[in-house]
Structures are given as C-alpha cells and as structure tokens.
C-alpha cells in the first residue's frame, strides 16, 4: 500500500483538497503544528489511554510507528490466534484498506 488515509486526513481532504495534497505529497512543506492543536492531539491520546482502563488486561497491537501499520495487522492476527480477548489498536486489512480500532473486545457473543 502506497498511502494511508486516516480519519483525520480524510476530513482534511473534505475541508481542503490542496491541504490534503500537500500533507500527503509534500509533508515537509506543511506548517508546524500550533501548540493549541498539539494539545488537542495529546488530549485524544489521553482519552484513548483512559478508555483502555475500562477494558484492562488487553494487549497492544500498536505498530512501532504509524508508517508501519501492517505490523499492527500482523500483531492483531497473532493476538486473535493466541486467544486474546482484548486488543488495543487492533488493525485489519481488506482490499488494500486498513481499519484500526481503539479497542477490540471479544465477549460471549463474539467480537
């Protein structure tokens, strides 16, 4: 897969196609992230960690970095095969589309 389009980059494209193009093809030209926006990103990360506390004892399928999302797909499949029932940052691929979940939980009814 050549390119990854997350929810936030998809929204960026809906808001401004030029912004999406620059972000995906000329990333080094983008303006630095303002501290106020970085605080919003950090808050989102904190919410994710708090959500994990609602489902303790899970395993983390996060990739080493966000440019290695297929690593997360492999970890997710390994965890499912090994019988894990709570997977943080579970990621799946179908037809070159990646879908990442904050928390995947298996209960008596299934996933």
Predicted features, each with a name:
Residues 1-110:
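Metal-dependent nuclease catalytic cores that hydrolyze phosphodiester bonds in DNA/RNA
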């Amino acid at each position: 897969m050549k390119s990854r389009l997350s929810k936030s980059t998809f929204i960026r494209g809906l808001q401004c196609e030029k912004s999406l193009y620059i972000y995906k093809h000329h990333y080094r030209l983008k303006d630095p992230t303002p501290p106020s926006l970085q605080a919003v990103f950090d808050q989102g990360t904190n919410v994710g960690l708090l959500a994990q506390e609602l489902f303790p004892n899970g395993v983390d399928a996060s990739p080493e970095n966000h440019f290695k999302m297929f690593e997360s797909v492999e970890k997710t499949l390994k965890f499912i095969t090994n019988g894990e029932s709570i997977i943080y940052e579970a990621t799946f691929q179908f037809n070159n589309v990646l879908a990442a979940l904050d928390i995947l939980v298996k209960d008596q009814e299934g996933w």
